[in-house]
């Protein structure tokens, strides 16, 4: 147990040399010679070497003082630098606020006050007062009459001495039973450590005691913040473990006994019986030892390399079977075992060995059967496992559960796959009994290297029998004919729901995929997804009872998925954007019939609502808001006049999908228009315009998840209108015929759920016939009003606006047919050069209802 003084001396010299090398680079140096006295020096970027005497020196963070043989330093203040007291050097009444005071062999520091920093002693420290920071007594060093106040720490290393210590309340002592001698007083009375025996030690506030092999500790008090660790072969008797203290022991101790907040405990002869670990305690059950009826309370931990029976693991406690971390090393035991455990809200991990007949309860309760180490025996779950009251059983790949009967009662079984060899991971249980519980199949979030699997690995769950009620959460890849599977080799009884993850990728047309097979029984399996359907690519799928004790996902072509309708909705909305913007220019052309002016600038704000249903099944509500700005000029001829103008505009559409989700279209438009009007009333107008559409899709799948995508597209169109305007007195009537054409370029894009969309050219090819009637009134102060009405019928001929979804969906997404439009408005001139207009319209037919289309604008002529 003792080390030679020569070894201690070598260690001291080496420590001093290393410290000097690390901390001594300075800019300048000064020396106080023998017989010389220096007072009041402040050391900044300076090394002071003292052979004589210094008084009232201040050492800054960049300063050092070396007190040599026969040198003396009095009343030194250390504020972050270093003071070295070498052999036969002496310092008195130092104040250590920060930094280091290092006393070498045969040096002495007397009456040092430590507020912060470290006093490191290889020689002697006499009457030190430790208010903060620490005093460290190294091998062969000695501290005499040290006073440890609240917040201070006295640490005694192996073969160190601390004599006549005064340990006050809230202070800390850190030591091992290999200290040469420690003795003094604490709040409990006299304490000591000598010859491998510790008596009446008080541990708190960062203090600790390590009881080494073949050593002893008697009547140790482990209070809040204190740590007592008893090594294999050590003995600790009469322990008083308080709340907040930490006790770490193993079943290989010779004997450990005492009391904690839960009562008396004892470990002896390789067996722990009725030990209740309280907050902060740790028990390590060593190989070929045993723990019986242990209670692992909140924030305590237990590691078992041997065997245990009847262990209870409380909430926030942690238990590991077959694995222990001892002195920084991880050890495994494949012979470890646990029988009859109760997990009441705690966490239990089975790394190796066998877990038998366990009960897990409470929402925080988790039993986790881990994946074995490479080429090692699998951890085993056997007997009956009861998982109750929202608790969870986690089983990782390659765990051995073939002889386990699992009873789930309002709880969860989660299976994790991460196979690097096969696309499928096999899980096998003897019996699975469920009551309102869930079985969840998923990829493993955990691996021993800390890296989760990067690809999907599917699970084949095989059980001999299945009974009860509950839910199975499974994954599918219909496009590649892969999925999680449930295989009941024997009888299956009860009522179960299968939940399948939605996806945007499509399988080949007509494909089905078997998810469940049983050997018989009256079990009923239905799809638990919303509405009893799951989105798989373009179409929805249902769970089909094949009639031979198997159930398969099968396509339902009568209903496309919400993601498909999202693609169709966005394609169908673009022509409506073009049309709403075109109406602002058409109204401008209609308002200037028979009016003389030179040049005008105009603006028109629009707000439009469209409720749309297409032949392909798209259904949405579009609300468009926009602004068009234009300029035109009128050129008079002998019997007619012409108009030429330019315009540009912006609009934003919010598109709400009937089956969930939404989209947005931002449109930027630019165009030109021209008109000719004869003095007899005949006229013809033409408009050409181009658009840039920025489209954003936020579709909703049936399970509520979002399918996101965005793409840009371009469009171009033209409109021509011809008619005749008759005027009599203040009345005007204007019948007309019009033709409109529009097309977009085709676009391909992919949604975030994997759905691929190929949107072809979306077109308008429309004829229109209508009549407008207006009445002009001149009021006072040059103000004029002109209310007007308009009615028209439109015939849409474009009937092959194709959209392809994945490889199995081809849709004609058009609104061909007859549509009626009814408008009313008023124009007003406020001054000879300023006028305004306001209009509203309603339209319906061919799958499009427009409850309103409002316009408001102003015109400035000059």
Label the predicted regions.
Residues 1-28:
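Gram-negative bacterial Sec-dependent N-terminal signal peptides
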Residues 743, 756-862:
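Outer membrane beta-barrel transmembrane domains
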Residues 42, 74, 92-93, 181-186, ...:
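Extracellular beta-solenoid/beta-roll
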Residues 568-570, 615-623, 658-666, 694-712, ...:
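Solvent-exposed, glycine/polar-rich loop segments of beta-barrel outer-membrane systems
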Residues 557-733, 840-841, 846-853, 859:
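Outer membrane beta-barrel translocator domains of Type V secretion systems
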Residues 506-523, 617-635, 757-762:
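Short secondary-structure subsegments characteristic of cysteine-rich extracellular domains
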Residues 51, 60, 68, 74, ...:
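Feature marks extracellular polysaccharide-active and adherence modules
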Residues 22-72, 180-210, 254-280, 284, ...:
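N-terminal segments that cap or nucleate solenoid repeat domains
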């Amino acid at each position: 147990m003792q080390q030679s003084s020569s070894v201690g001396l070598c260690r001291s010299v080496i420590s001093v040399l290393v410290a000097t090398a690390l901390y001594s680079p300075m800019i300048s140096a000064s020396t106080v010679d023998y017989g010389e006295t220096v007072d009041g020096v402040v050391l900044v970027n300076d090394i002071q070497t003292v052979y004589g005497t210094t008084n009232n020196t201040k050492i800054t963070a960049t300063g050092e003082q070396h007190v040599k043989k026969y040198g003396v330093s009095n009343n030194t203040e250390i504020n972050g630098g270093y003071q070295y007291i070498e052999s036969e050097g002496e310092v008195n009444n130092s104040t250590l606020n920060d930094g280091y005071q290092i006393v070498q062999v045969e040096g002495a520091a007397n009456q040092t006050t430590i507020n912060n920093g470290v006093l490191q002693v290889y020689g002697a420290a006499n009457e030190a007062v430790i208010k903060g920071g620490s005093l460290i007594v190294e091998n062969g060093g000695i501290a005499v009459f040290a006073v440890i106040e609240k917040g201070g720490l006295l640490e005694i290393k192996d073969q160190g001495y601390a004599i006549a210590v005064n340990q006050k309340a809230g202070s800390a002592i850190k030591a091992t039973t290999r200290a040469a001698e420690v003795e003094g007083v604490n709040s409990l009375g006299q304490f000591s450590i000598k010859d491998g025996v510790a008596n009446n030690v008080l541990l708190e506030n960062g203090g600790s005691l390590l009881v080494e092999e073949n050593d002893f500790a008697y009547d140790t008090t482990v209070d809040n913040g204190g740590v007592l660790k008893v090594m294999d072969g050590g003995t600790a008797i009469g322990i008083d473990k308080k709340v907040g203290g930490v006790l770490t022991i193993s079943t290989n101790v010779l004997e450990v006994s005492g009391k904690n907040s839960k009562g008396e405990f004892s470990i002896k002869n390789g067996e722990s019986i009725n030990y209740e670990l309280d907050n902060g305690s740790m028990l390590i059950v060593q190989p070929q030892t045993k723990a019986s009826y242990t209670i692992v309370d909140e924030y305590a931990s237990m590691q078992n390399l041997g065997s245990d029976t009847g262990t209870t693991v409380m909430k926030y406690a942690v238990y590991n079977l077959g694995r222990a971390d001892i002195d920084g090393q991880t050890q495994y035991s494949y012979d470890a075992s646990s029988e009859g455990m109760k997990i009441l809200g705690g966490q239990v991990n089975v790394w190796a060995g066998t877990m038998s007949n366990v009960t897990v309860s409470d929402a925080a309760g988790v039993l986790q059967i881990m994946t074995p180490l490479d080429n090692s025996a699998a951890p085993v779950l056997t007997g009956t496992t009861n998982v109750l009251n929202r608790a969870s059983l986690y089983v990782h790949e390659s765990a051995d559960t073939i002889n386990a009967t699992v009873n789930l009662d309002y709880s969860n079984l989660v299976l994790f796959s991460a196979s690097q060899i096969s696309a499928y991971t096999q899980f096998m249980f003897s019996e699975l009994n469920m009551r309102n519980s869930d079985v969840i199949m998923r990829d493993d979030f955990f691996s021993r290297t800390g890296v989760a699997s990067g690809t999907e690995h599917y699970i084949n769950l095989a059980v001999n029998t299945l009974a009860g009620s509950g839910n199975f959460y499974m994954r599918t890849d219909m496009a590649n004919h892969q999925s999680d599977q449930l295989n009941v080799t024997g009888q299956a009884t009860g009522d179960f729901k299968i939940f399948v993850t939605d996806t945007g990728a499509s399988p080949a047309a007509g494909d089905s995929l078997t998810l469940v097979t049983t050997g018989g029984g009256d079990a009923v399996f239905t799809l638990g997804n919303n509405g009893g359907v799951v989105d798989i690519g373009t179409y929805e799928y249902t769970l089909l009872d094949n009639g031979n004790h198997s159930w398969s996902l099968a396509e339902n072509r009568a209903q496309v998925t919400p993601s498909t309708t999202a693609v169709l909705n966005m394609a169908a909305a673009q022509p409506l954007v073009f049309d709403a913007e075109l109406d602002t220019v058409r109204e401008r052309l209609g308002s200037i019939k028979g009016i003389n002016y030179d040049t005008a600038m105009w603006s028109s704000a629009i707000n439009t609502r469209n409720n749309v249903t297409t032949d392909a099944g798209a259904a949405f509500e579009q609300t468009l808001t926009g602004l068009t700005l234009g300029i035109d000029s009128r050129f008079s001829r002998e019997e007619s006049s012409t108009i030429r103008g330019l315009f540009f505009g912006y609009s934003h559409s919010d598109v709400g999908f009937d089956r969930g989700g939404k989209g947005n279209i931002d449109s930027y438009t630019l165009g030109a228009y021209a008109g000719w009007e004869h003095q007899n009333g005949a006229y013809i107008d033409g408009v050409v315009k181009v658009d840039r559409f920025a489209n954003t899709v936020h579709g909703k799948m049936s399970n509520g998840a979002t399918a996101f995508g965005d793409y840009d597209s371009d469009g171009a169109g033209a409109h021509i209108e011809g008619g005749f305007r008759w005027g009599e007195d203040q009345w005007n009537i204007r019948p007309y015929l019009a033709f409109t054409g529009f097309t977009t370029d085709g676009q391909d894009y992919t949604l975030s759920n994997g759905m691929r969309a190929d949107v072809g050219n979306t077109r308008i090819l429309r004829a229109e016939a209508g009549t407008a009637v207006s009445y002009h009134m001149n009021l006072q102060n040059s103000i004029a009003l002109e209310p007007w009405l308009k009615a028209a019928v439109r015939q849409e001929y474009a009937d092959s606006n194709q959209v392809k979804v994945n490889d199995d969906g081809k849709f004609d997404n058009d609104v061909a047919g007859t549509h009626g439009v009814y408008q009313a408005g008023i124009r007003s001139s406020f001054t000879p050069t300023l006028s305004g207009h306001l209009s509203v319209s309603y339209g319906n037919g061919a799958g499009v209802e427009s409850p309103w289309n409002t316009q408001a604008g102003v015109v400035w002529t000059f």
